């Protein structure tokens, strides 16, 4: 029962974290920047934001973004962070699909428990890997951006990335380390049997 609960907790935590990583990858409010001194920017109410895909200017009543489309002149850290965040977002899809197939309520034919266990371990490893990719990108980007322009604060995209990466890391560790062994996955299977009166559900027994 404990292993089953941990599997569900790991899945939910990882799924929410993966959504946070996708939000971070697709938005541009990574860091809030200032082209002048910070007091001047606050007085003029003119701040900017910088992300993986665009540089934006936020003035009174205006919001304008310049897409970063020229790959040849982009700083290396921007391109590297793009690759890391895209990899994290893509790795999340097979990880979540694998976790769906190992949930206690899902059964795929008469497969042994060891098959579910191996899929769960693979999903957990993928989650840990994508979390590490996101952590590296969301730390590397603001550090390098600070060398180019004054950073006023971190944006919501960066916070979403940190939270999402930590949740995926926790979810992956729970799946790999705490969700039971191959035998527990086998014991969590259910079968459907039809009787003369009404259908019943019973837990499979192994000798």
UniProtKB/Swiss-Prot annotation:
- Which Gene3D superfamilies does the entry link to? 1.20.140.150
Its protein name is Claudin-11
Pfam families under this entry? PMP22_Claudin (PF00822)
Domain of life, per UniProt, equals Eukaryota
User: What GO MF terms are annotated?
Assistant: identical protein binding; structural molecule activity
Sorted alphabetically, the Gene Ontology cellular component annotations on this record are: axon; basal part of cell; bicellular tight junction; lipid droplet; myelin sheath; neurofilament; plasma membrane; tight junction
Q: Which cysteines are joined by disulfide bonds?
A: none
Protein function: Plays a major role in tight junction-specific obliteration of the intercellular space, through calcium-independent cell-adhesion activity.
Q: Which UniProt keywords apply?
A: Cell junction, Cell membrane, Membrane, Phosphoprotein, Tight junction, Transmembrane, Transmembrane helix
Q: How does it assemble?
A: Interacts with tetraspanin-3/TSPAN3. Interacts with OCLN.
What the entry lists under InterPro entries is as follows:
Claudin, Claudin11, Claudin_CS, PMP22/EMP/MP20/Claudin
Query: Where, in residue ranges, is this chain on the Extracellular side?
Result: 23-82, 144-157
**Where does this polypeptide localize?**
Cell junction, Tight junction; Cell membrane
**Intervals, Cytoplasmic compartment:** 1, 104-122, 179-207
Annotated membrane topology is: Multi-pass membrane protein
Give the sites modified to Phosphoserine: 193-194, 197-198
